[in-house]
Curated annotation (Swiss-Prot):
Expressed in flowers, leaves, roots, and stems. The gene is OPT4. It comes from the Eukaryota. It comes from Arabidopsis thaliana. This is Oligopeptide transporter 4. The modification N-acetylalanine is found at A2.
Length: 729
């Protein structure tokens, strides 16, 4: 990559990757405020926010991203450009200004804004608004109530607060050329590919329709007729009476040795579509996954019986008593929604499955290793680029953007002030529902403000975004224990507002490269966020009130899809960090104090790698050892399971290694299109199945609809532990 000193041409970017991907031209006459943009953008945002929230409670929660909309809206946009009338007419109150439903051909700038709308509908890649989890755990797990208005304010303010941080930092991490945001180049490449002239017999649009129909038609098989195909765990079939064999072979509750799926939702759940992940990322995830699942976990469980691991399932996100029974969480919550210490001491300390304990330890290590790794391997580069961003000349893209009216700073200041005031009112006047005191909001906002700039710089220059959710949970758990909802509210305001800010800034940089007027970006992001958040809570409220025993796996009908795996982990985190508190889990009063050593191990790991790199500079493979990626490879487990990882790695390797290497022209034309079509086809069929047979509770009952047939995988292996449905040694 060229450095700033080596670079002198003022008409190109100083970053080589940007020079190769982003055009240095702009046509400011292209219309962006078109009927097509608003029509397709609002529909896309509404549809994605509905579908993503709808799927979020399912066992395999498919996340439909903006790429689906990017591909699907292209032919629709061209169709509207052909059929809409071109007549120009005036609008009341607009003077002599004229407006047309069809100002000309469907252009790339319209397409970008539609995709930004869609990105808001997918909560910027997260699926649904993170704060919806608070409403879910209150209603479905704790069995308490929260008002709709309190829930809506939580969702909207936590997202818009992130927008305020983004506005304050836009000048520092969007406009400078050296803040180049590598992930945006994928989007730029896709937009350019989609808008190139397509003279092939099999156009991208035709391929998309064919693949969508196939995906739509096939999903009825694993989605309704033969649900066992979601996790084909053949080891369990071969050893129907062996607990150990089923622990090893279960794709949903075990190590998943040999388990695979024929269900796209299982492939793309949690980790998103493997077709859009580069192979080097897949390889890093594979190494980290294999090390944990097939080496560390078996050794800790069967080899050392660490923390009495064999008293509990090997793979579970549930919480347990010391004798292996499921912990009765509601029993230790008093009428004030706080920890009942006497009832807690009666049940005893909370115990985790070996896998769940290791994931927290690896989470600690990942946080520490990320900071150390970035400081050692990228610190000088980040410092140089940030210095250049102040002193360096404007690049061609920043100069081209000067043609458009900038966003006044007072827009962001006003938004930030209003959001903080509304949030303070929420904490003061609805404190009985959210528990968080006003000083908690101030502390969370201060943490978000402090961390947003360095995290944005790291993401903009290295494409790594350190996850700081555990830090916020840990801090609030130490300061204000015994109050679960206060803890998760603190996490959402502190961590997620920062994460949202990074996502907003990423979109701003995409608009910067695509030469989208900044005020158009502002309004589309803001309107999309409000619309998506409102639809998220409306759909969640409907599902929580209409699906009987939703999220209660032990009370749901067999093989019900409404198990809420992500919210189960969110609930467990509220218990561990908020209700019981880290002192009683990872401190002197808990069983897992030794897990804190993972912080030190994670911090020292990159130092060792960096030292080896300095000692042996000719060994080119040493700096490729990326410990944050390796340690964080299984960050989505739980709720993700072994079958999700197995299938994601397999499919990603096929397409992004073999197809990419040996059929590159096909990959360039159709890979992203296929990914979008698979997501869309499954989404439409799943919704159709729910409204046609799901609401009527019409289900099939035969061997192929009774799960993966690994019922013994949930059993402990220690002697004398009694669990319903499990053999006693």
């Amino acid at each position: 990559m060229a450095t700033a000193d080596e670079f002198s041409d003022e008409d190109t970017s100083p970053i080589e990757e940007v020079r190769l991907t982003v055009t240095n031209t702009d046509d400011p006459t292209l219309p962006v405020w078109t009927f097509r943009m608003w029509f397709l953008g609002l529909i896309s945002c509404s549809l994605l926010s509905f579908l993503n929230q709808f799927f979020s409670y399912r066992t395999e929660p498919l996340v439909i991203t903006q790429i689906t909309v990017q591909v699907a809206t292209l032919p629709i946009g061209h169709f509207l450009a052909k059929v809409l009338p071109k007549t120009r007419f005036g609008l009341p109150g607009c003077g002599s200004a004229r407006f047309s439903l069809n100002p000309g051909p469907f252009n790339m700038k319209e397409h970008v804004l539609i995709s930004i709308f869609a990105n808001a509908g997918s909560a910027f890649g997260s699926g649904s608004a993170y704060a919806v989890g608070i409403i879910t755990i209150i209603k479905a797990f704790y069995g308490r109530s929260i008002s709709f208005i309190a829930g809506w304010l939580l969702i909207i303010t936590t997202q818009v607060l992130g927008y305020g941080w983004a506005g304050l930092l836009r000048k520092y991490v969007v406009e400078p050329a050296h803040m180049w945001w590598p992930s945006t180049l994928v989007q730029v490449s896709l937009f350019r590919a989609l808008h190139e002239k397509d003279d092939q017999r099999m156009t991208r649009a035709k391929f998309f329709v064919i693949a969508l129909v196939c995906s739509f038609g096939w999903y009825i098989v694993p989605g309704y007729l033969f649900t066992t195909l979601t996790s084909i765990s053949w080891v369990c079939w071969a050893f129907p009476r062996s607990v150990t064999a089923q622990q090893i072979g279960s794709g949903m509750r075990g190590l998943g040795l040999g388990a695979f799926t024929l269900d796209w939702t299982a492939v793309a759940s949690f980790l998103f579509s493997p077709l859009i992940s580069p192979f080097f990322a897949i390889a890093n995830v594979f190494i980290g996954y294999v090390l944990l699942i097939y080496f560390v976990l078996p050794l800790a469980y069967w080899g050392f019986d660490s923390y009495n691991a064999t008293r509990f399932p090997i793979f579970s996100s549930h919480l347990f008593t010391s004798v292996g029974n499921t912990y009765d969480i509601p029993a230790i919550v008093n009428d004030n929604f706080e920890l009942d210490l006497a009832k807690y001491e009666q049940q005893g300390r909370i115990n985790l499955s070996m896998f769940f304990a290791l994931t927290y330890g690896l989470g600690f290590a990942t946080i520490a290793s990320t900071l150390t790794h970035v400081a050692l391997f990228y610190g000088k580069e980040i410092s140089e680029r940030f210095r250049v961003s102040y002193k360096g000349k404007e690049d061609i893209h920043t100069r081209l953007m000067k043609r458009y009216k900038d966003i006044p700073s007072w827009w962001f200041y006003s938004m930030l002030a209003a959001t903080l005031l509304i949030s303070l009112a929420l904490c003061v006047f609805l404190n009985d529902e959210v528990q968080m005191p006003w000083w908690g909001l101030v502390f969370a906002s201060a943490m978000a403000f402090v961390f947003t700039l360095p995290i944005s710089i790291i993401t903009a220059t290295t494409n790594q975004t350190p996850g700081l959710n555990i830090i916020t949970e840990y801090a609030m758990g130490l300061i204000y224990p015994g109050r679960p909802i206060a803890n998760v509210c603190f996490k959402v305001y502190g961590y997620m507002s920062m994460a949202q800010a990074v996502s907003f800034l990423n979109d701003f940089k995409l608009g910067h490269y695509m030469k989208i007027p900044p005020r158009s970006m502002f309004l589309v992001q803001f309107i999309g966020t409000i619309l998506a958040g409102t639809i998220n809570i409306t759909v969640a409220w409907w599902q929580l009130n209409s699906i009987k025993n939703i999220c209660q796996e032990e009370l749901l009908p067999p093989n019900s899809p409404w198990t809420c795996p992500g919210d189960r982990v969110f609930f467990d985190a509220s218990v561990i960090w908020g209700l019981v508190g880290p002192k009683r889990i990872f401190g002197s009063q808990g069983n897992y104090a030794a897990m804190n050593w993972f912080f030190l191990g994670g911090a020292l790991g990159p130092v060792i790698v960096w030292s080896l790199h300095k000692a042996f500079p000719k060994r080119s493979w040493i700096p490729l050892v990326n410990l944050p990626v390796l340690l964080g490879a299984t960050a989505m487990m739980p709720p993700a399971t072994a079958v999700n990882y197995n299938s994601w790695i397999l499919v990603g390797t096929i397409f992004n290694l073999f197809v990419f290497r040996y059929r590159k022209s096909w990959w360039q034309r159709y890979n992203y299109v296929l990914s979008a079509a698979m997501d869309a086809g499954v989404a439409f069929m799943a919704v159709l199945l729910y409204f046609s047979v799901g609401m009527e509770e019409k289900s099939l009952d035969w061997w192929g609809t009774r799960g993966e047939h690994c019922d013994l995988a949930k059993c402990p292996t220690a002697r004398g532990v009694i669990v319903d449905g499990c053999p006693v040694k």
